């Protein structure tokens, strides 16, 4: 029997009030299972990123609850939620978000520095070996390719062994071949370490490889392509 890791109960999101109010996400339920790869797909402005941010603890819903390991993350205070994001959740963004003044190594290890934990050197070696950037750890982001920068961002998201990883258009700034290779490495790494992966993508070929496909149309959650 599969275990739930994330559950959204009647979540919705409305921006503004009165006549100017815009409903970005209509009341919906969603369940994500432990260890699965789920994709979120839909047209631009359909509500994909809004849903991802709500599920990841970055944007409170207007209504509803988000349960991570059975705990309502938006019932937590700011400090508790920040701790959950640092220890249980990993994020990968389209624009990499690497610090230019830091080495690749330090960029990857930022989750440990923020949480005052001792870096996991064994995990660092294993991840960077799988991702093919072990020889780039002393370089600055400007000294490596876009594909390598995104691999560093993937390593940063996974190295703290989060329960769940959210990726918002992780291949959006990469060419087709590099994007395919990067996505393959991301799914392989998440599977290797037993992490649940939720990816927002506009690419149906990437979406089709997921165990669960979540389609967003005009703020409504629809399962499947």
Language model regions located:
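ABC family nucleotide-binding domain
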Residues: 4-215
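H-loop (His-switch) and adjacent beta-strand-loop-beta switch element
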Residues: 213-225
């Amino acid at each position: 029997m599969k275990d739930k890791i994330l559950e959204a109960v009647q979540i919705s999101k409305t921006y503004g009030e009165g006549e100017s109010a815009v409903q970005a996400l209509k009341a919906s339920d969603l369940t994500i299972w432990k260890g699965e790869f789920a994709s979120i797909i839909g047209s631009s402005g359909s509500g994909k990123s809004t849903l991802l941010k709500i599920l990841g603890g970055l944007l409170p819903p207007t209504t509803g609850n988000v349960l991570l390991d059975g705990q309502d993350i938006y019932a937590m205070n700011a400090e508790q939620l920040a701790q959950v994001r640092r220890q249980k959740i990993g994020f990968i963004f389209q624009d990499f978000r690497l610090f230019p003044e830091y080495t690749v190594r330090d960029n990857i290890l930022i989750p440990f520095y923020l949480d005052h934990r001792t870096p996991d050197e064994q995990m660092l070696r294993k991840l960077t070996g799988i991702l093919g950037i072990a020889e780039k750890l002393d370089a600055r982001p400007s000294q490596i390719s876009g594909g390598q920068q995104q691999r560093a961002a993937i390593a940063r998201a996974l190295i703290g062994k989060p329960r769940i990883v959210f990726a918002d258009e992780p291949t959006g700034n990469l060419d087709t071949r590099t994007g395919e290779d990067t996505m393959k490495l991301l799914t392989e790494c998440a599977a290797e370490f037993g992490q649940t992966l939720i990816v927002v993508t506009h690419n149906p070929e990437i979406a089709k490889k997921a165990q669960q496909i979540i389609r967003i149309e005009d703020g409504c959650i629809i399962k499947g392509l």
